């Protein structure tokens, strides 16, 4: 590992943006101005130097920052990706694994929307070893005695803050989430991963980034998968999208672009 200059980045296939300084008492969206000022200081120069690869963004608030990375770079929507709800989805799978005592690798479940407080768990489309999760709950009532899905969802949302309150940062989980995205790009895995992707009609929305499952390959976001949502999930996703739109307007007021 060594330091280098902007010009050397022109040869890279992927650039990971990970600047951030979240404190214990801060919400992710409260980081917005500082994060946008940070990306404005280098993204245009990186593109000017000849970088023609894919940006992967970790920086919070990741959905909003990823939107402005695309605006600053002028790249196509598929070549700017955020980690989004990737880590949150992994946490949901871990929690469901603990409840059911089944390997998380055979559990398919996603958190959708904002990587933040308004994200929602897509229980209605989740599966355990191919069995619809809600059906599995009905046939295994002993495992879910006293378990409320709303509490599990809130547990996912609170996990990051519990970690930050304990050691003042998070690094291993988000590092693994980011490496999965980069690996899928490098090896053209066409793997379905939850990430922050640009909506262009999917789920009935357009013009911003939010957390959804997508096929990731050598071109970045190859395709966004539209999962069925029940009424509660649809309303929650709508609320999360409203937050995205609101803070994009806040970001624009900073005259970043």
Give the role of each language-model region.
Residues 1-13, 27, 245-254:
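Conserved N-terminal Rossmann-fold NAD(P) cofactor-binding segment
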Residues 15-17, 57-58:
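Redox-cofactor binding/interface segments in oxidoreductases and associated redox assembly factors
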Residues 19-21:
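Conserved NAD(P)H cofactor-binding loop of Rossmann-fold oxidoreductase domains
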Residues 24, 64, 164-166:
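Short, solvent-exposed loop/turn segments at secondary-structure junctions
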Residues 27-94:
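Rossmann-like NAD(P)(H) cofactor-binding subdomain of soluble oxidoreductases
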